[in-house]
Amino acid sequence: MYKRQGKARIAREGKDLTIVAHSYMVLEAIRCADVLKVKGVSIEVLDLRSIRPLDTDAILNSVKKTGRLLVADNGWVHFGVSAEIISIVTENIFDRLLCAPERIGMNNSPSPSTRALANNFYPRAKDLAKIVCKILKKKVDLEALFPKSSLSQDIPDPAFNGPF
């Protein structure tokens, strides 16, 4: 099935905060949004679908609506997609932001070569939720909401069918 590149889609509607994600991080962002919804947190998840061309209009429109931004990057945060998205937002609609944008991605270290090292390398929905709660100044028991997964951190969710 062909999807038009350069056109993002809203994977979840929300009003409190925008999570911009691409590739595998879309699944983690959706999981975060769905879990925090039970605590009254309304998260808009924007699935970029492609990073080149980048749908800057969709990003800016979503952040204008929510006033808050978290970029979930499936790469390193330094010099990556998340840095560029935050630059675009702050250069264009800085006055619409209610707080500083945040980003999450892989730890600033080499890719892990063992499962033990992988556990602290790949961001998961719970990691996104921790940042969302910080941004929104919400106290939520994340341990209760996100039970420990039986999957190793270096094994993607079975619902994902892209490269990992």
Listing of model-derived features with the role each one plays in the protein:
Residues 3-164:
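Thiamine diphosphate
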